[in-house]
């Protein structure tokens, strides 16, 4: 998954099973303009890390320093840079209507600013043209956690307000070069998780954390303030890009620009007032952290009160910039959690302590042998509730499910659990639509197996299996690919046939 299993409380969650989601549906039950697709991201899919002018990203550095779980890297990954034509053909054969992928800033503008790499430009033009030839909508993420290392070295990347101008200039290149064929743009992937994992717990690049808050060895960073600084700069960056697009491109190109959020639905562990408040506080610290400023112009009151002077403030000019700077909301949603009250500790706190909740995925902790840390259970109802909550809390925006899928340590082609998962969550989306939520698309994570940011090559999420031991990186369809294809092609009740 993107950064997704990192949600809020990395590696400490257990897993639950809650049923839900419409059953007996077909493709025709969804609105005519609704799109179904699948997703990847640049560092996780492309490979070709040192080819054709690409410069390192913070993920290259993080992985090569051995900080990932399996010590693997995305140097080759699924080798999408060389295999995209075959993959797009496979997408068309599967019946995909859209494909969400990210652009590598370091491949397009290797120094982070300045000269455009013509080989990078050629590659992305080729991908977009290949999709158009096959009748597949491109949905582009401008940055999927892979900041150019050059900017990290120069001014600490997201910790500096200088990132706003550099990112906006990069986005300008993308809109100018690709916007005649791309109508759906997402600025940032999971800023709520990028700030937490990259600058508090340290499990995501660039791996900043400070003791005792990190979940890894902490050598650089300050967990008490850096998550808030980086999220603040991400919000300002997103808003600046939206303003650029609206003023310079939207009237001509007719596209839309949104932001992506990691979504985890929080149930109260009990019906106590304290747990009900904890579940709401979790939502405010997760969804509200990013969306409240972009809709209402400021952070949620509970964050301002709890974090106090450690939370940056917006100037009046910045408030005017950020308020209303969303055309759509993209969410990455994988599972739900039970949340209960945890007293707010005195003294030094990080984001997790500021939130003052405990979270788990089972109401009672199961024996450890009954779950795998790379897997999680099905709760389609949680996705439905999340969508309905976001609509009620932040407005009737269009929504796209930009990632949803099931990772597993099982590398088999026969993956009925993934079929059940995807089928259930698509049903949850349909339930939300029937309840009035303007959901316009659903993307499975991932189209093919990729390098997972938390699990490396230990977890597989692809509809299509990639043999990472074979230099040719061959693809083979899993049962889930066959089910999804049958569904997209209108079969009323796709038969689950094990792949040959």
Swiss-Prot record:
A beta-D-glucoside binds at residues 44, 144, 334, 403, 445. Disulfide bonds join 209-218. Residues 1-24 form the signal peptide. It is an enzyme of class 3 (hydrolase). It comes from the Eukaryota. It catalyses: Hydrolysis of terminal, non-reducing beta-D-glucosyl residues with release of beta-D-glucose. GO terms for biological process: carbohydrate metabolic process. The active site is at residues 190, 403. GO terms for molecular function: beta-D-fucosidase activity; beta-galactosidase activity; beta-glucosidase activity. Glycans are attached at residues 222, 410. Belongs to the glycosyl hydrolase 1 family. This is Beta-glucosidase 2. It comes from Oryza sativa subsp. japonica. The lineage of its organism: Eukaryota, Viridiplantae, Streptophyta, Embryophyta, Tracheophyta. The gene is BGLU2.
